[in-house]
Amino acid sequence: MGERLRTLETPDGRVLAYAMWGDLDGFPVLALHGTPGCRLERWPHEELYAELGVCLVTHDRAGYGRSDRRRGRRVADEPDDVRAIADELGFDRFGVTGGSGGGPHALACAALLPDRVVRAACIVGVAPLGTPGLDEDAWLAGQDPENVKEVRWAQAGEGVLAPQLEALFQQAQVRVAADPSTVLADFELSESDQAQLATPERMQVIRESILEQAVGGVGGWVDDDLAIISPWGFDVDVISVPVLIRYGLTDVLVPPAHGEWLAANVPGCLVKVDGVAGHLGSDPAEEISEQLLWLSTGVAPPESTAGPRA
C-alpha cells in the first residue's frame, strides 16, 4: 500500500500520513481508525466508496504508522490533524466517522469543528470514563478481561503500559503471519465477531494494518490508551452537528453500556442498535454503505431512532 501513502506537515511541524480511497472527486469523509490501527483500516473493496460517490480519507493518528508522535495528546487534539488534512485537500465541509477508539476522536471533531463537519458517526465508540451515569465499574462492566488488563496498565502510566503493548504487538505480528483470524484469540468474542474475523476481507485488513501500525513503535497506541481514559478535553453535550451512534449488543470490547451512554448524552443523535452484532458488525458492507450514505446525504439508516435528546 506504499503507493497510497501521502504526507503533510502539520502547523506544529509534525509529519502526518494519510491515504485516499474511492471517488477522489466525491463527498469527503474522514475516517478515524480504532485503537490500535492505522490508515489502512477500511473496507477493502474500494468500489463501494466510488459507487456511493464518497472520497474516503484515512490517516495514521499521531504516533501510528508513518505519522510523528504527539506525546501527551488528548482526544480533543485530534481535530487539529483532521483540520490540517481537510485544509491540505481543499475540503471546506466534510463528514467524519470513527470506530471503537476512533469514536471519541470523531465526537471531538463534531464538538470542536462545527463549522467544518457536516455530520459525524461514532461506531461502537468508547464513552468517557468516570462521567455521571458511567462510573469506572460501569465503564468496565462487560469488557473482556484482556481489555480490562490494558485499562489497568494505562491507569498505572506509560512506564507500565508501553512495554506491555510492545509485547502484545510482537505477539500480534507472529499471529498475523500465521493466521490473521487468531489475532484476538485471547479474547472471548461473540459468535458474530468470531465469524467476522474469519472473512477474507477482515483478514486482509488485519494483516495490512498490523504490519503497518507500529512501524515507528507503539507510541500511538500508548497515547491513545492514555487519552481515552483521561479527560477528553471537551463535553459531548456541546455537540451541535448531527451524529449517528451505532453499537452492538454482543460487543465485549466496547460493551453496549458505552453506546447507551452516548445515545443518551449526545444531543440530537441518531441511534442504530444491532441486537446480533459484536464489535465488528454483522454485515459490514451494508453497515458501511448505510453509514456513508447518511454522512454524505443525511439519509438515516433503516431502523435508526432519535436519541432522547433529539
Locations of the language-model features?
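Short beta-strand/loop motif that positions the catalytic acidic residue
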Residues: I239, I245-Y247, D251
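Catalytic active-site module of serine/aspartate enzymes centered on a nucleophile-bearing elbow/loop
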Residues: G268-A310
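N-terminal cap/lid segment of alpha/beta-hydrolase-fold proteins
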Residues: M1-M20
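Conserved alpha/beta-hydrolase "acid-adjacent" motif
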Residues: V252-H258
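Conserved HGGG/HGGXW glycine-rich cap/lid loop of the alpha/beta-hydrolase fold
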Residues: R14-R66
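Conserved hydrolase catalytic core segment
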Residues: D92-A138
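Conserved acidic catalytic loop of the alpha/beta-hydrolase fold
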Residues: D77-G95
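Alpha/beta-hydrolase
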Residues: L140-F234
